[in-house]
Amino acid sequence: MSPVSVISLPSDLCLPTSFIDRSGRELNPLHITIPNVAMRRQGKLMTRASMSVNLRTAVSDDAVIRRRGDFHSNLWDDDFIQSLSSHYGEPSYRERAERLIGEVKNSFNSVSNEDGESITPLDDLIQRLWMVDSVERLGIDRHFKKEIKSALDHVYSYWSEKGIGCGRESVVTDLNSTALGLRTLRLHGYDVSAEVLNHFKNQSGQFACTLKQTEDQIRTVLNLYRASLIAFPGEKVMDEAETFSAKYLKDALQKIPVSSLSREIGDVLEYGWHTYLPRLEARNYIDVFGQDTENSKSYMKTEKLLELAKLEFNIFHALQKRELEYLVRWWKGSGSPQMTFCRHRHVEYYTLASCIAFEPQHSGFRLGFAKACHIITVLDDMYDTFGTLDELELFTSAIKRWDPSATECLPEYMKGVYMIVYNTVNEMSQEADKAQGRDTLNYCRQAWEEYIDAYMQEAKWIASGEVPTFEEYYENGKVSSGHRVSALQPILTTDIPFPEHVLKEVDIPSKLNDLASAILRLRGDTRCYQADRARGEEASCISCYMKDNPGTTEEDALNHINAMISDVIKGLNWELLKPNSSVPISAKKHAFDISRAFHYGYKYRDGYSVASIETKSLVKRTVIDPVTL
C-alpha cells in the first residue's frame, strides 16, 4: 500500500470525521479540524470538492484517511422484521382463493357463450378487453393465462387498420376500445400498429374529443394515455397521443371531484408504465376497483375479482414475511452488519423484487435479486469512497483468482467483502444450476469480473480527477450500473428455461441488456451527479457531456440525458414486445422488469442512498401491511 502524503490547502478545513478500524468497524465519531491537509491517492491530488462536508472522512488504524459516504443506517432492523405477523398462510385462505379462481374462470368462459343480455355482439370486444385489463391490474392474471389468450385471440381476429368498435358487429370503430385494445394486444406480443390512432384525429390533426368531460370521455382519454406509454421507436402518433392525453387528464383533475376515478388518473399520471411496478399497481387498484360506474355496469360481478385480488395480495404477504426473515438471517450471517462503511438496503431491494415478481414459485428470483443488489451496493461504496486505489487493485485481482486464499493479501475489511461476494455468487450459481440443468458458475463469474473491472476504471477516474469523454464514460457506466449482474443469476433460478440462444437475447450481447443497463446509468446519474460530485466523483453523464460540448449548461446536459432516456424506454419496449420474436416475452420479462424497478428507485431522487418517503411507502404498502378483506 502506498503511503498517504499531505499537502497544504489555503485555509483550514473542518470535517465531520469518524475513526474506523481495518475491519470497517466505526469507532467514536467526532468533529476535528484538519489544518491544511488533503489526501493523495496513488500520487493524485484529491480536490477540496472530494473533501466536502457532504462526505465523512475517517482515519483507520493503519493511518489511511478514508472517504466515506454519509448514509443513514438500515431502517428495518431484525426485531422489526421478526415482529411482522400474518395468518394468511393458513390453508383455508388458499382454499378460498382457489374457489374464487374457478368462479372467475367460469366468468371468462361465459363470454364465449353470449346470452344476448349481459354481453352481445355489440360489446363483446370491450368486455373481453376489460376483463383482461382488470385481472392484470389487480395482479391476479397468472391464474388466467389460457383465458386471457383466448379472449385476446378473439379481439385480434376483428382488429383492422382502423381499430375496433365495442363489439364485433359495431358499425363504427371506437377510440376507447381501440386504445385499450392497442395497449393490451401489444403487451401480449400481437402485431398491432400505432398508426390506427390516426383515424381518431379531426381535420386539424387533433384527437377528436368533446370539450365536455364526462366520465366516459375521461376514461377514453385515460386509456389513450395508457396506450401511448407502450410506444416503440419512431412512433410519432404515440408521442402526440401522450402529449394530448396527459394535458387533458391534468385539466380534468382540476375539475372533477375527488373520487375513485380521480385517484386512478392521479396514479397513472404519477407512475406511467415504466415505473408503475405491478404489485404497487395492484395495491393501488384494489383501493379504487369496483367503485366507479364502468365497473358496476360490467357483466362480471366485481366483488369476486376484488375478493380474489385481496386474498392473493395477503397470501403472498405471508410468504414475504418468511422470505424477509430468511434474508435478514443471511444478511447477518454474511457479516454485513460489520461493514459500516456501506449502505444496507437489502429490505428495499427485496421489496423491489417482490413488486415485479410475486409468483410464489419465484422465491429464488426475489431473494437472489436482493442478495445481488446488496453485494453491488457494498462494492459500489467500497470502490467509490472507502477503498484506496492500491487496495482496490488488489481486490480486483483477487476476484479474478476466485479462491478464498486470495484474501491473504487484502486488508481486513476487504476480506469480509470478498467472502460475501465469493460465497453468494457460488450459492446463487448452485440454485441456477438446479433450475437450468447445467453449470452456470463460470459464465456468471465472467459477468462479475467485467463489473468489477468497470468499477476499477471509475476508481481510477476518481483518483485522478479525470473527466473522460461521454462515450467512454457511458460505455463503461452501462457495465458499472450493475444491471447485468443484478439480473443474470436471479433469472436463471426461475422455472423459465434459458438455453444459449435465449440467454443471448436477454443477457449480453442483447439489445435488451444494453438498453436496460443504459437506463440505469442515465437515470442514476441525473439523480446522483450532484452528491457524487460533492464526494469528489467528477465523472458523470452530465459532466462528460458538458466537457464534450463546451458552452453547454447543466440544464442543457440534463435535457439531453432525459431525451436519451425517453428513447431508451421506447427501445426497451420494442425489445420486450416486438412481434414474431423467437424468444417469448416471458423469458425477457424479468430482466425488463428489473430495469423498471431500478427506474422506480430513481424516479424522484436517489432512493438507494437515502430511503425517501416514497421508498418507505413502497415497503409499507407492498410488503409490511396487508389489505383489509
From Swiss-Prot:
Signal peptide positions (record): none
SUPFAM superfamilies: Terpenoid cyclases/Protein prenyltransferases, Terpenoid synthases
Record: residues binding Mg(2+) 1: D380, D384
Record-level Gene Ontology MF annotations: magnesium ion binding; pinene synthase activity; terpene synthase activity
A GO cellular-component term linked to this record: chloroplast
Residue span of motif DDXXD motif: 380-384
TM ranges: none
Reactions this protein catalyses: (2E)-geranyl diphosphate = (1S,5S)-alpha-pinene + diphosphate; (2E)-geranyl diphosphate = (1S,5S)-beta-pinene + diphosphate
Name of this protein: (-)-alpha pinene synthase 1, chloroplastic
Localization (cell): Plastid, Chloroplast
Alphabetically ordered keywords of this record: Chloroplast, Lyase, Magnesium, Metal-binding, Plastid, Transit peptide
Record remark on domains: The Asp-Asp-Xaa-Xaa-Asp/Glu (DDXXD/E) motif is important for the catalytic activity, presumably through binding to Mg(2+).
Domain of life the protein comes from: Eukaryota
GO biological process: alpha-pinene metabolic process; diterpenoid biosynthetic process; green leaf volatile biosynthetic process; terpenoid biosynthetic process
Membership in a protein family: Belongs to the terpene synthase family. Tpsd subfamily.
Primary location: plastid
Listed cofactors: Mg(2+); Mn(2+)
EC number: 4.2.3.119, 4.2.3.120
Pfam families named among the record's database cross-references: Terpene_synth (PF01397), Terpene_synth_C (PF03936)
Protein role: Monoterpene synthase (TPS) involved in the biosynthesis of monoterpene natural products included in conifer oleoresin secretions and volatile emissions; these compounds contribute to biotic and abiotic stress defense against herbivores and pathogens. Catalyzes the conversion of (2E)-geranyl diphosphate (GPP) to (-)-alpha-pinene and, to a lower extent, to (-)-beta-pinene.
Details of cofactor binding: Binds 3 Mg(2+) or Mn(2+) ions per subunit.
Gene (UniProt): TPS-(-)Apin1
